[in-house]
Amino acid sequence: MQCLHRTRQGFIEEKTATYNRLRGLISESGVIAPQSTDALRHMVSAQKSSLPLQVQQCVDDLLEHVDRIEANITEYDRILSRIAKTDHRSQRLMKLKGVGPTTACALVACIGNAHDFKNGRQLAAWLGLTPSQYSSGGKSKLGRITKAGDSYLRTLLVQGARSVLIGAEKRTDLFSRWVCSLVERRGYWRAVVAIAAKNARLCWASLHYGDDFRLYSAS
């Protein structure tokens, strides 16, 4: 199953590189390219006719290429979703908010039953979701997350955490209120990392304890 994730990750990296080439191409023509891919495609659609003909051809080819890549990613997500539905470990993981089929399959493929980690904090640290420490004025302080370990798994957990934040804004249940208060207290990105790290710890517990793990007792 890891081959599926490695190939999917390669498609994602290629997609990012293609969009960056597109940004660079239109920037050479004096057009400021937005970072958002949706905004970039909208802007290109609106302004393409004002670009030189050769640039227009390159833009069309790059967009066609990225469309094929996105179709491949979608197909791999379908395959991984089917696998997740037949794997009891993945099914348990998907009960966590922010953990979908792709993330669940990736965790199972990479860390199995999580027995190589003593606890959930160790897994979160291995994934680079814990803040670095440094000394200033004789005091120990926390810095940015280390971003160590498996970047693919970390990215999936962070993306899942972002979806949790988006969903929480529209709900009033206890968990959603906690998420919203976390954003207010710590800011958006710190809240995203905190939720991703919490999910990493819960994923460890689910994989380590198996059917003995009870989500409500951990959350």
Where are these regions (language model features)?
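Non-catalytic, well-ordered alpha-helical scaffold segments
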Residues: 2-5, 9, 16-23, 56, ...
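Glycine-rich, often acidic, oxyanion-interacting loops/wings at catalytic, nucleic-acid
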Residues: 3-92, 217
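Short helix-capping/linker segments at secondary-structure and domain boundaries
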Residues: 18-19, 73, 112-116, 162-172, ...
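Short, polar/charged, Gly/Pro-enriched helix-capping and turn/loop motifs at alpha-helix termini
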Residues: 25, 32, 83, 171, ...
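Phosphate-backbone recognition surface of nucleic-acid-processing proteins
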Residues: 92-95, 101, 105-188
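Low-complexity, acidic/Ser/Thr- and charged residue-rich accessory regions of DNA metabolism proteins
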Residues: 137-138, 176-219
